[in-house]
Design a protein with these regions (language model features):
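Hydrophobic, small-residue-rich membrane helices and short re-entrant helix-turn-helix hairpins
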Residues: 143-154, 192-195, 215-244, 261-274, ...
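Membrane-interface loop-to-helix entry segments
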Residues: 142-170, 348-359, 378-388
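TM-loop-TM module centered on a large, flexible mid-protein loop between adjacent transmembrane helices
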Residues: 72-78, 248-298, 305, 349
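Membrane-water interface regions at transmembrane-helix termini and the short interhelical loops
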Residues: 67-75, 134-155, 221-224, 333-346, ...
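Selective recognition of specific alpha-helical transmembrane segments in multi-pass small-molecule
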Residues: 56, 60, 158-170, 234-260, ...
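A generic transmembrane alpha-helix motif of multi-pass inner-membrane proteins
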Residues: 173, 374-443
């Protein structure tokens, strides 16, 4: 460490690769592959939208946490109101924790890495594997201070090496041509929009504001002290992580886009990867893919359990961190038994609610100094965003009141596409600025 408390190159890379590995889990494997299959020859346009939410927003999330000087997500969200901050943060952690994202890591690991090797057995191996998977996740989550060494220095290099092998082979043995796009990706504008919404499924923007706290802690432990250096370093290691994510997304989506004519369409991205790896490498391909999936899903599972345990222990200190880790690991195991397709379907309405709220709070954090950090601007913007996001979530779940749904779809720009929250957020921001101006004039 030198005198101006900058990190060493090794520390930069270790923390950057740790963050990549925390992001790169179940959804980052299956959703680009599924997007590629659906988008076909429009995969480039769909990827553009997907990268905005799957790469751009996570980077903004990490940057916002570093820039804001907030010690956690709740403190940032409490700029709206303390009660909102608490409820939003609990919802966020439960979604990326035991309810959806963490169980998904186990189910994807089983579907891709284990199931192809056990299909001939009379015994159902899924419960046994999931118990082992979350047992290992629990064990490795007990000591969070060892996360950089275990993931950044060990798991991530191994993961990247095996992914690189798959990418090189996909160039040497290309699949057939690009498929005809499905209707949702039929032209460039719709493909970009659908890709943007598909990026919600990775949950990386939600996780970014959580993982950023881990990164900030590790940056400080590595020797950085001043706020300026911590912010700069967090953004740089975030850039390393999302650049790696973007590169991998491009190649996985391309494999999906060129796999349809040979293998047909699949319900999820899991079998796309499985049959493609088998085609590229033969029987050995399934082993390579199994290693990628196990490493990716395990590292993400550890990061999510660690983050959730840390937050809830802080919220209720009388319950130990280790007990919370046990609770979340057991809960994730139980919910993972419902299967991958059920978990994905159940998560979508919640994501349609939480994603707009997260995007807007991140943007407000980055614009904090522009409007003087006034609470009225935060409150009005988030209140308006909540109206549309809640309606979209209800629509996606199929429980929205028919009259309201018709009104929103007819009069709110992009509401039918799940993007009506943009208009509401802008309107709320303007109202907040007017409120700020009126209050200032009356002083």
């Amino acid at each position: 460490m030198n005198g101006n408390d900058n990190l060493s190159t090794r520390a930069y890379l270790a923390i950057g690769m740790m963050l990549f590995a925390l992001f790169f889990g179940a959804g980052n494997l299956i959703f680009p592959a599924a997007l590629g299959q659906q988008a076909g020859s429009n995969v480039g346009w769909a990827l553009f939208g997907f990268v905005l939410t799957g790469v751009g927003l996570p980077l903004l999330g990490v940057a916002a946490m570093g820039y804001s000087s907030c010690k956690d997500v709740e403190e940032l969200a409490s700029r709206v109101h303390p009660i909102y901050g608490l409820l939003y943060t609990i919802s966020l952690y439960l979604s990326i924790g035991p309810m959806f994202a963490t169980p998904r890591t186990g189910t994807v690991a089983y579907e891709i890495a284990i199931k192809p090797f056990t299909e001939g057995l009379s015994m159902n191996m899924e419960p046994i594997f999931l118990a082992l998977f979350f047992g290992v996740s629990l064990w490795l989550s007990i000591s969070p201070h060892k996360l950089v060494n275990r993931i950044g220095n060990i798991l991530t290099p191994a993961l990247l090496l095996v992914i690189l092998l798959l990418i090189i082979k996909s160039f040497m043995t290309p699949l057939v041509g690009y498929a005809v796009p499905q209707p949702a990706y039929g032209d460039a504008p719709t493909a970009v929009l659908q890709g943007f919404l598909d990026g919600y499924n990775t949950m990386d923007a939600l996780a970014s504001v959580v993982f950023a706290i881990l990164v900030i802690d590790f940056v400080r432990l590595s020797g950085a002290t001043s706020h300026a250096v911590v912010t700069k370093t967090v953004m740089e290691v975030g850039a390393i992580a999302v650049a790696l994510l973007g590169i991998v997304y491009v190649f996985i989506a391309n494999i999906g886009a060129t796999s349809v004519e040979r293998f047909g369409l699949f319900d999820t991205g899991a079998p796309v990867l499985s049959v493609s790896a088998n085609y590229l490498f033969g029987g050995f391909g399934q082993i390579i893919l199994a290693i990628i999936v196990l490493l990716a899903c395990l590292s993400t599972s550890i990061g999510l359990i660690t983050s959730c345990g840390t937050y809830f222990h802080k919220l209720t200190p009388k319950i130990s961190y280790k007990l919370y880790v046990v609770i979340f690991s057991v809960a994730a195991f139980g919910l993972s038994m419902f299967g991958l397709k059920t978990i994905i379907s159940a998560a979508i309405p919640v994501l349609m609610l939480l994603y707009p709220l997260t995007i807007v709070i991140v943007l407000l954090a980055l614009l904090h100094n522009v409007f003087g950090g006034r609470r009225c601007v935060y409150a009005w913007t988030m209140a308006f965003t909540m109206i549309s996001a809640l309606m979209t979530g209800l629509e996606t779940a199929g429980i929205a009141p028919a009259t309201l749904e018709q009104l929103f779809t007819q009069y709110i720009p992009f509401q039918a596409a799940g993007m009506g929250w943009v208009s509401f957020a802008v309107l709320g921001f303007i109202v907040g600025l007017i409120h700020k101006g009126l209050v200032s004039e009356n002083k």
